[in-house]
Amino acid sequence: MQTVIKNGTVYQNGRLIHADVLIEDQKIKAIGTDLTGDKVIDATGKLVSPGLVDVHVHYRDPGQTYKEDIETGSKAAAHGGFTTVGAMPNVTPVPDTPDLMKKMVQENKQKGIVHIFQYGPITKNETTDELPDYAALKKAGAFALSNDGHGVQTAQTMYLAMQEAKKNDLIVAAHAQDDSLFNHGIVNEGEKAKELNLPPVTELAETTQIARDLLLAEKTGVHYHICHVSTKTSVELVRMAKACGINVTCEAAPHHLLLTEDDIPKDNGYYKMNPPLRSKEDQAALLVGLLDGTIDLIATDHAPHAKQEKQGGMQNAAFGITGSETAFSTLYTKFVKEDKVFTLEQLLSWLSDQPAKVFGLKKAGVLEPGCPADVAIFDLEHETELKEKNYQSKGINTPFTGQKIYGATVMTMVDGEVVYQRGEK
Protein backbone atom coordinates (compact mmCIF):
# COMPACT_ATOMS: atom_id res chain seq x y z
CA MET A 1 0.00 0.00 0.00
CA GLN A 2 1.14 3.52 -0.77
CA THR A 3 0.55 6.38 1.65
CA VAL A 4 0.91 9.99 0.59
CA ILE A 5 1.27 12.96 2.94
CA LYS A 6 -0.28 15.81 0.96
CA ASN A 7 0.22 19.56 0.86
CA GLY A 8 2.61 19.96 3.78
CA THR A 9 5.59 22.23 4.30
CA VAL A 10 8.39 19.68 4.08
CA TYR A 11 11.83 20.03 5.68
CA GLN A 12 14.38 18.49 3.32
CA ASN A 13 18.11 19.09 2.94
CA GLY A 14 18.05 22.17 5.14
CA ARG A 15 15.19 23.80 3.21
CA LEU A 16 11.43 24.15 3.62
CA ILE A 17 9.48 23.25 0.48
CA HIS A 18 5.81 22.79 -0.34
CA ALA A 19 5.56 19.13 -1.35
CA ASP A 20 3.93 15.73 -0.97
CA VAL A 21 5.70 12.73 0.57
CA LEU A 22 4.99 9.26 -0.84
CA ILE A 23 5.59 6.22 1.38
CA GLU A 24 5.74 2.60 0.24
CA ASP A 25 7.14 -0.56 1.87
CA GLN A 26 8.26 1.32 5.02
CA LYS A 27 10.39 3.74 3.01
CA ILE A 28 10.16 7.16 1.43
CA LYS A 29 9.43 6.50 -2.24
CA ALA A 30 9.23 10.05 -3.56
CA ILE A 31 9.01 13.71 -2.56
CA GLY A 32 7.33 16.01 -5.07
CA THR A 33 4.08 17.59 -6.18
CA ASP A 34 0.80 16.01 -7.23
CA LEU A 35 1.73 12.59 -5.82
CA THR A 36 -1.02 10.02 -5.30
CA GLY A 37 -1.44 7.02 -3.04
CA ASP A 38 -3.92 4.51 -1.66
CA LYS A 39 -4.10 6.38 1.66
CA VAL A 40 -3.95 10.17 1.94
CA ILE A 41 -2.84 12.12 5.02
CA ASP A 42 -3.77 15.78 4.69
CA ALA A 43 -0.93 17.97 5.99
CA THR A 44 -2.29 21.27 4.73
CA GLY A 45 -0.92 24.03 6.95
CA LYS A 46 1.34 21.57 8.78
CA LEU A 47 5.08 21.04 8.99
CA VAL A 48 6.30 17.66 7.69
CA SER A 49 9.67 16.84 9.19
CA PRO A 50 12.01 13.90 9.30
CA GLY A 51 11.45 12.02 12.52
CA LEU A 52 13.48 13.89 15.13
CA VAL A 53 16.62 12.34 16.64
CA ASP A 54 17.38 12.54 20.39
CA VAL A 55 20.75 11.07 21.32
CA HIS A 56 20.21 11.43 25.07
CA VAL A 57 17.34 9.72 26.92
CA HIS A 58 17.00 7.74 30.14
CA TYR A 59 14.46 4.91 30.06
CA ARG A 60 15.15 3.44 33.56
CA ASP A 61 14.55 -0.06 32.22
CA PRO A 62 15.54 -2.42 33.75
CA GLY A 63 15.81 -1.51 37.41
CA GLN A 64 13.60 1.54 37.95
CA THR A 65 10.57 0.96 35.78
CA TYR A 66 8.33 2.78 38.26
CA LYS A 67 9.92 5.96 36.80
CA GLU A 68 9.81 4.94 33.12
CA ASP A 69 10.15 1.87 30.93
CA ILE A 70 11.06 1.24 27.33
CA GLU A 71 7.44 1.26 26.19
CA THR A 72 6.42 4.49 27.92
CA GLY A 73 9.71 6.20 27.14
CA SER A 74 9.42 5.41 23.45
CA LYS A 75 5.77 6.53 23.45
CA ALA A 76 6.90 9.82 24.96
CA ALA A 77 9.51 10.14 22.22
CA ALA A 78 6.90 9.53 19.53
CA HIS A 79 4.59 12.09 21.17
CA GLY A 80 7.38 14.64 20.81
CA GLY A 81 8.05 13.76 17.17
CA PHE A 82 11.21 11.74 17.88
CA THR A 83 11.64 8.52 15.92
CA THR A 84 15.24 7.72 16.85
CA VAL A 85 16.77 7.92 20.33
CA GLY A 86 19.98 7.01 22.13
CA ALA A 87 19.31 5.29 25.46
CA MET A 88 21.80 5.84 28.28
CA PRO A 89 23.15 2.78 30.13
CA ASN A 90 22.51 3.96 33.71
CA VAL A 91 20.04 1.15 34.33
CA THR A 92 20.23 -1.82 36.69
CA PRO A 93 22.15 -3.87 35.80
CA VAL A 94 24.39 -1.66 33.68
CA PRO A 95 24.83 -3.39 30.28
CA ASP A 96 28.59 -3.77 30.67
CA THR A 97 28.89 -7.33 29.31
CA PRO A 98 28.05 -8.64 25.84
CA ASP A 99 25.18 -10.75 27.18
CA LEU A 100 23.62 -7.82 29.04
CA MET A 101 24.08 -5.58 26.00
CA LYS A 102 22.46 -8.12 23.68
CA LYS A 103 19.52 -8.39 26.06
CA MET A 104 19.12 -4.60 26.21
CA VAL A 105 19.20 -4.31 22.42
CA GLN A 106 16.59 -7.06 22.09
CA GLU A 107 14.34 -5.48 24.73
CA ASN A 108 14.61 -2.09 23.05
CA LYS A 109 13.56 -3.60 19.74
CA GLN A 110 10.72 -5.67 21.18
CA LYS A 111 9.22 -3.04 23.50
CA GLY A 112 10.07 0.25 21.82
CA ILE A 113 7.89 1.91 19.20
CA VAL A 114 10.75 4.10 17.95
CA HIS A 115 14.30 3.20 16.91
CA ILE A 116 16.37 2.89 20.09
CA PHE A 117 20.15 2.88 19.90
CA GLN A 118 21.84 1.65 23.06
CA TYR A 119 24.88 3.20 24.73
CA GLY A 120 27.40 0.99 26.46
CA PRO A 121 29.14 2.24 29.61
CA ILE A 122 32.63 3.76 29.57
CA THR A 123 33.50 1.84 32.74
CA LYS A 124 32.06 -1.24 34.39
CA ASN A 125 28.97 -0.39 36.43
CA GLU A 126 29.60 3.25 35.38
CA THR A 127 31.29 3.89 38.74
CA THR A 128 34.52 1.85 38.61
CA ASP A 129 37.88 2.39 36.93
CA GLU A 130 37.68 -0.92 35.07
CA LEU A 131 36.92 -0.87 31.35
CA PRO A 132 34.49 -3.34 29.79
CA ASP A 133 35.36 -5.10 26.54
CA TYR A 134 34.46 -2.38 24.04
CA ALA A 135 34.87 -4.61 21.00
CA ALA A 136 32.47 -7.16 22.48
CA LEU A 137 29.97 -4.47 23.50
CA LYS A 138 30.03 -2.99 20.01
CA LYS A 139 29.51 -6.40 18.45
CA ALA A 140 26.57 -6.93 20.83
CA GLY A 141 24.95 -3.70 19.66
CA ALA A 142 26.41 -0.70 21.52
CA PHE A 143 26.54 2.34 19.22
CA ALA A 144 28.54 4.64 21.53
CA LEU A 145 29.88 4.83 25.09
CA SER A 146 28.74 6.95 28.04
CA ASN A 147 28.69 6.97 31.83
CA ASP A 148 25.99 9.63 31.76
CA GLY A 149 24.96 10.54 35.26
CA HIS A 150 28.56 10.07 36.34
CA GLY A 151 31.76 11.80 35.35
CA VAL A 152 34.82 9.61 34.86
CA GLN A 153 36.76 10.77 37.90
CA THR A 154 40.23 9.45 37.11
CA ALA A 155 42.19 10.95 34.22
CA GLN A 156 44.10 7.73 33.63
CA THR A 157 40.83 5.80 33.32
CA MET A 158 39.46 8.26 30.78
CA TYR A 159 42.75 8.22 28.87
CA LEU A 160 42.68 4.43 28.59
CA ALA A 161 38.98 4.51 27.72
CA MET A 162 39.59 6.97 24.90
CA GLN A 163 42.43 4.87 23.53
CA GLU A 164 40.25 1.75 23.47
CA ALA A 165 37.25 3.63 22.09
CA LYS A 166 39.41 5.00 19.28
CA LYS A 167 40.59 1.47 18.41
CA ASN A 168 36.98 0.34 18.19
CA ASP A 169 35.65 3.43 16.41
CA LEU A 170 33.27 4.30 19.24
CA ILE A 171 32.25 7.78 20.38
CA VAL A 172 32.91 8.67 24.03
CA ALA A 173 29.93 10.76 25.20
CA ALA A 174 30.88 12.31 28.53
CA HIS A 175 28.90 13.66 31.44
CA ALA A 176 31.59 16.14 32.46
CA GLN A 177 31.55 16.37 36.23
CA ASP A 178 34.32 16.44 38.81
CA ASP A 179 32.62 15.11 41.94
CA SER A 180 35.12 16.75 44.30
CA LEU A 181 34.06 20.14 42.92
CA PHE A 182 30.38 19.26 42.51
CA ASN A 183 30.47 18.42 46.22
CA HIS A 184 26.78 17.48 46.66
CA GLY A 185 25.64 20.78 45.17
CA ILE A 186 22.03 21.50 44.21
CA VAL A 187 21.76 24.93 42.52
CA ASN A 188 24.17 26.93 40.37
CA GLU A 189 26.66 28.92 42.43
CA GLY A 190 25.35 32.46 42.73
CA GLU A 191 22.61 34.58 44.25
CA LYS A 192 19.87 31.98 43.75
CA ALA A 193 21.77 29.39 45.79
CA LYS A 194 22.18 31.97 48.57
CA GLU A 195 18.53 33.00 48.36
CA LEU A 196 17.34 29.40 48.66
CA ASN A 197 20.06 28.49 51.16
CA LEU A 198 21.03 25.47 49.08
CA PRO A 199 24.48 23.98 48.40
CA PRO A 200 26.00 25.62 45.30
CA VAL A 201 27.36 23.91 42.19
CA THR A 202 30.42 25.67 40.81
CA GLU A 203 30.78 25.76 37.03
CA LEU A 204 34.29 24.37 37.61
CA ALA A 205 32.75 20.96 38.28
CA GLU A 206 31.91 20.87 34.57
CA THR A 207 34.59 22.98 32.96
CA THR A 208 37.67 21.45 34.59
CA GLN A 209 36.69 17.99 33.42
CA ILE A 210 35.95 19.24 29.92
CA ALA A 211 39.39 20.87 29.80
CA ARG A 212 41.02 17.63 30.97
CA ASP A 213 39.11 15.51 28.50
CA LEU A 214 39.84 17.79 25.56
CA LEU A 215 43.57 17.33 26.14
CA LEU A 216 43.08 13.56 26.35
CA ALA A 217 40.95 13.60 23.20
CA GLU A 218 43.64 15.56 21.36
CA LYS A 219 46.23 12.98 22.38
CA THR A 220 44.12 9.93 21.46
CA GLY A 221 42.21 11.24 18.44
CA VAL A 222 38.96 9.78 19.75
CA HIS A 223 35.61 11.36 18.87
CA TYR A 224 34.79 13.04 22.18
CA HIS A 225 31.19 14.21 22.63
CA ILE A 226 30.15 16.33 25.59
CA CYS A 227 26.65 15.87 26.96
CA HIS A 228 24.55 18.85 28.07
CA VAL A 229 27.12 21.66 28.07
CA SER A 230 25.73 24.34 30.33
CA THR A 231 28.27 27.12 30.91
CA LYS A 232 29.86 29.96 28.96
CA THR A 233 33.33 28.61 29.72
CA SER A 234 32.36 25.15 28.45
CA VAL A 235 31.31 26.68 25.14
CA GLU A 236 34.55 28.68 24.94
CA LEU A 237 36.62 25.55 25.62
CA VAL A 238 34.86 23.62 22.86
CA ARG A 239 35.21 26.54 20.46
CA MET A 240 38.96 26.68 21.07
CA ALA A 241 39.29 22.90 20.81
CA LYS A 242 37.52 22.83 17.45
CA ALA A 243 39.79 25.61 16.21
CA CYS A 244 42.75 23.42 17.21
CA GLY A 245 41.38 20.48 15.24
CA ILE A 246 40.35 18.33 18.20
CA ASN A 247 37.64 15.82 17.29
CA VAL A 248 34.98 17.14 19.66
CA THR A 249 31.23 17.62 19.41
CA CYS A 250 28.71 18.68 22.02
CA GLU A 251 25.03 19.08 22.76
CA ALA A 252 22.82 21.54 24.61
CA ALA A 253 19.64 20.56 26.44
CA PRO A 254 16.34 22.41 25.88
CA HIS A 255 15.99 23.38 29.54
CA HIS A 256 19.40 25.07 29.61
CA LEU A 257 18.43 27.04 26.50
CA LEU A 258 14.98 28.00 27.77
CA LEU A 259 15.53 28.56 31.49
CA THR A 260 18.05 30.10 33.88
CA GLU A 261 18.51 30.02 37.63
CA ASP A 262 16.42 33.21 37.78
CA ASP A 263 13.39 31.20 36.60
CA ILE A 264 13.40 29.04 39.74
CA PRO A 265 10.34 30.50 41.50
CA LYS A 266 11.01 28.93 44.87
CA ASP A 267 12.47 25.78 46.39
CA ASN A 268 10.81 23.59 43.74
CA GLY A 269 12.04 20.09 42.89
CA TYR A 270 10.90 20.35 39.27
CA TYR A 271 13.75 22.82 38.70
CA LYS A 272 16.43 20.46 40.03
CA MET A 273 18.55 18.98 37.29
CA ASN A 274 22.17 18.12 36.61
CA PRO A 275 23.85 20.22 35.31
CA PRO A 276 21.78 22.83 37.13
CA LEU A 277 20.09 25.79 35.52
CA ARG A 278 22.82 28.38 35.02
CA SER A 279 23.07 32.17 34.69
CA LYS A 280 21.65 34.39 31.95
CA GLU A 281 25.22 34.88 30.71
CA ASP A 282 25.63 31.12 30.37
CA GLN A 283 22.28 30.82 28.58
CA ALA A 284 23.27 33.53 26.11
CA ALA A 285 26.57 31.76 25.45
CA LEU A 286 24.72 28.52 24.66
CA LEU A 287 22.57 30.29 22.09
CA VAL A 288 25.62 31.90 20.49
CA GLY A 289 27.33 28.50 20.52
CA LEU A 290 24.46 26.92 18.63
CA LEU A 291 24.35 29.70 16.08
CA ASP A 292 28.09 29.67 15.35
CA GLY A 293 28.36 25.87 15.20
CA THR A 294 30.32 25.36 18.41
CA ILE A 295 27.37 23.38 19.78
CA ASP A 296 26.43 20.72 17.25
CA LEU A 297 22.99 19.60 18.30
CA ILE A 298 20.17 19.66 20.83
CA ALA A 299 19.42 16.59 22.98
CA THR A 300 16.78 16.41 25.68
CA ASP A 301 18.41 14.45 28.53
CA HIS A 302 14.88 13.08 29.11
CA ALA A 303 15.10 12.00 32.77
CA PRO A 304 11.72 10.91 34.19
CA HIS A 305 11.07 10.37 37.88
CA ALA A 306 8.11 9.27 39.96
CA LYS A 307 5.98 12.16 41.22
CA GLN A 308 6.91 11.61 44.86
CA GLU A 309 10.62 11.87 44.02
CA LYS A 310 10.18 15.48 42.92
CA GLN A 311 7.88 16.66 45.69
CA GLY A 312 8.95 19.03 48.43
CA GLY A 313 12.16 20.97 48.31
CA MET A 314 15.15 20.71 46.01
CA GLN A 315 17.45 19.34 48.69
CA ASN A 316 15.84 15.91 48.66
CA ALA A 317 14.35 15.82 45.16
CA ALA A 318 15.91 13.65 42.46
CA PHE A 319 17.94 15.33 39.71
CA GLY A 320 16.25 15.38 36.32
CA ILE A 321 13.63 16.78 33.97
CA THR A 322 11.61 15.15 31.21
CA GLY A 323 12.08 16.51 27.70
CA SER A 324 10.91 14.18 24.96
CA GLU A 325 7.36 15.54 24.81
CA THR A 326 8.10 19.23 25.20
CA ALA A 327 11.40 19.89 23.39
CA PHE A 328 10.31 20.82 19.88
CA SER A 329 7.23 22.83 20.81
CA THR A 330 8.85 24.86 23.60
CA LEU A 331 11.97 25.63 21.55
CA TYR A 332 9.93 26.51 18.46
CA THR A 333 7.57 28.76 20.39
CA LYS A 334 10.28 30.68 22.26
CA PHE A 335 13.14 30.94 19.79
CA VAL A 336 11.53 30.72 16.34
CA LYS A 337 8.01 32.13 16.64
CA GLU A 338 8.37 34.65 19.46
CA ASP A 339 11.98 35.84 19.82
CA LYS A 340 13.20 34.96 16.31
CA VAL A 341 16.62 33.96 17.65
CA PHE A 342 16.98 31.27 15.01
CA THR A 343 15.07 29.85 12.08
CA LEU A 344 12.81 26.83 11.88
CA GLU A 345 15.32 25.24 9.50
CA GLN A 346 18.10 25.63 12.07
CA LEU A 347 15.98 24.17 14.87
CA LEU A 348 15.00 21.17 12.77
CA SER A 349 18.62 20.56 11.80
CA TRP A 350 19.78 20.57 15.43
CA LEU A 351 17.02 18.08 16.26
CA SER A 352 17.28 15.77 13.24
CA ASP A 353 20.05 15.63 10.66
CA GLN A 354 22.78 17.05 12.90
CA PRO A 355 22.50 14.47 15.73
CA ALA A 356 22.23 11.71 13.13
CA LYS A 357 25.34 12.99 11.37
CA VAL A 358 27.38 13.41 14.56
CA PHE A 359 26.60 9.88 15.75
CA GLY A 360 26.75 8.22 12.35
CA LEU A 361 23.10 7.16 12.37
CA LYS A 362 22.78 6.65 8.65
CA LYS A 363 19.41 7.38 7.06
CA ALA A 364 18.04 8.80 10.33
CA GLY A 365 16.90 12.41 10.57
CA VAL A 366 16.40 12.91 6.83
CA LEU A 367 13.56 12.73 4.33
CA GLU A 368 15.02 11.21 1.17
CA PRO A 369 13.79 8.55 -1.27
CA GLY A 370 15.05 5.18 -0.10
CA CYS A 371 15.32 6.20 3.55
CA PRO A 372 13.07 4.77 6.29
CA ALA A 373 9.69 6.48 6.42
CA ASP A 374 10.30 8.09 9.81
CA VAL A 375 8.17 11.23 9.76
CA ALA A 376 6.83 13.80 12.21
CA ILE A 377 3.99 16.20 11.43
CA PHE A 378 3.68 19.35 13.56
CA ASP A 379 0.97 21.99 13.90
CA LEU A 380 2.67 25.38 13.90
CA GLU A 381 -0.52 27.42 13.47
CA HIS A 382 -2.61 26.64 16.52
CA GLU A 383 -1.81 27.36 20.15
CA THR A 384 -2.21 24.53 22.65
CA GLU A 385 -1.37 24.02 26.31
CA LEU A 386 1.05 21.47 27.74
CA LYS A 387 -1.02 19.31 30.09
CA GLU A 388 -0.03 16.43 32.35
CA LYS A 389 -2.95 14.33 31.16
CA ASN A 390 -1.51 14.27 27.64
CA TYR A 391 1.96 13.04 28.58
CA GLN A 392 2.85 9.53 27.49
CA SER A 393 5.82 9.30 29.87
CA LYS A 394 5.42 8.04 33.41
CA GLY A 395 7.36 11.14 34.42
CA ILE A 396 5.57 14.47 34.72
CA ASN A 397 8.61 16.23 36.16
CA THR A 398 8.79 19.31 33.98
CA PRO A 399 8.23 22.97 34.82
CA PHE A 400 6.85 23.54 31.31
CA THR A 401 3.42 22.07 32.16
CA GLY A 402 0.79 24.76 31.71
CA GLN A 403 2.81 26.64 29.11
CA LYS A 404 1.02 27.75 25.94
CA ILE A 405 2.90 26.46 22.91
CA TYR A 406 2.84 26.19 19.14
CA GLY A 407 4.26 23.16 17.35
CA ALA A 408 2.27 20.34 18.89
CA THR A 409 2.85 16.95 17.28
CA VAL A 410 -0.02 15.88 15.05
CA MET A 411 1.36 12.53 13.93
CA THR A 412 4.55 10.47 14.14
CA MET A 413 5.40 7.60 11.81
CA VAL A 414 8.14 4.99 12.21
CA ASP A 415 8.92 2.86 9.15
CA GLY A 416 5.70 4.15 7.61
CA GLU A 417 3.50 3.07 10.52
CA VAL A 418 1.64 5.60 12.66
CA VAL A 419 2.98 5.33 16.23
CA TYR A 420 1.45 8.54 17.56
CA GLN A 421 -1.63 10.48 16.50
CA ARG A 422 -2.94 13.55 18.27
CA GLY A 423 -6.00 12.84 20.34
CA GLU A 424 -5.10 9.21 20.97
CA LYS A 425 -3.60 8.35 24.37
From Swiss-Prot:
Enzyme Commission number(s): 3.5.2.3
Binding site for Zn(2+) 1: 56, 58, 148, 301
Gene3D superfamilies: Metal-dependent hydrolases (3.20.20.140)
Enzyme type, top EC level: hydrolase
Entries under InterPro entries matching the protein: Amidohydro-rel, DHOase, DHOase/Allantoinase_Hydrolase, Dihydroorotase_CS, Metal-dep_hydrolase_composite, Metal_Hydrolase
Example GO molecular function: zinc ion binding
Residues reported to bind substrate: 58-60, 90, 274, 305, 319-320
Active site residues according to the UniProt entry: 301
GO cellular component terms attached to this protein's record: cytoplasm
Pathway the protein takes part in: Pyrimidine metabolism; UMP biosynthesis via de novo pathway; (S)-dihydroorotate from bicarbonate: step 3/3
Catalytic activity from the UniProt record: (S)-dihydroorotate + H2O = N-carbamoyl-L-aspartate + H(+)
UniProt-recorded name of the protein: Dihydroorotase
